Amino acid sequence: MGIIFDKLDQLWNTFRRESSILVLGLDNAGKTAILYTLQLGEAVLHTVPTIGFNVEEVIIGNVNIKIFDIGGQDSLRQLWPHYFESASGIAFVIDSADLDRIELARNELHALLSSKDLVGKPFLILLNKQDLPNAKRRDEMIDILQLKQCKSSKWHILECIATKNQQLTTGFRWLADHI
C-alpha cells in the first residue's frame, strides 16, 4: 500500500509548477511574519528585522513557490530590482495601521507597478495588521493607494493579519493562480 502512495506522490509532483514570489514592503510591515506563518501554517509571533532576505518554499495547490522575503529598510529597498527578473509575482505588504507611512508605501508600490521588469506580473497587495483599531480598510486603501489607475499589472488587494493563515493562503492561492 505504501508503494501506491509513493507512486501517486511522484506523479503529483511531476505536475507541480514552480515559481518565485517576492514579498516586498516597508520595514515593519509584517513580511517575515507572513512568510513564516505561511510556511509553518501557524502564527509566528516574534520576528527580527530582516537584514538582507529570507527564502522559504511553500506549496500552494499544485505550485511550489519559493518565497523571497526581502528587507524593507530604505537601504535594502535599493536592492529590490536585482530580484525582479526571476520573480513570477509580487506580494506587497502594507502596515495598514501605520498612517504616517502609507504615502511612502504607496510611492514604493507605484514604483514597483511601473517597473518595466514587473509589467504583466501579478501583484498581491496585503493590508496587514487589520487587528489594530486604526487600520485602514480595503475600500479606503484602494483609493489611498490610487490602485484604480494601475493598468500595467493585474492586482488583488486583501486585508490580513500576519498571524492568521487563512487570509494569507487565500491571497497566495490567488497569486499562484495568476502566475
Question: What annotation goes with each model-predicted range?
Answer:
Residues 1-179:
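TRAFAC-class small GTPase G-domain
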